[in-house]
Amino acid sequence: MKDKEYQLLKSKFLKAVANVPIPLRDEIIAVVDNENISWRVAEAEIKKDAPKSKVILEQLKKIGVV
C-alpha cells in the first residue's frame, strides 16, 4: 500500500470510527495474525501507525468500511 493511499484510508477510518456508537466499539471488525481487532484496537493501532495498521485498513477496505 502506498503512503498516499494509506493516509486516505486512515482519514476515512478515523471519520468512520467517530460515528460508531460507543457500545459497538468493542465489536470485532478484523482479524490480524489470528488476533481479533475491535474498533477500539483498530483505532489505537491506526493512530500510532503501527505495523498492523496497514493490514487492518486493507481488510476494512475489502469489506467496504473505508
Language-model regions, residue ranges each:
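A short, conserved structural fragment
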Residues: K61-V66
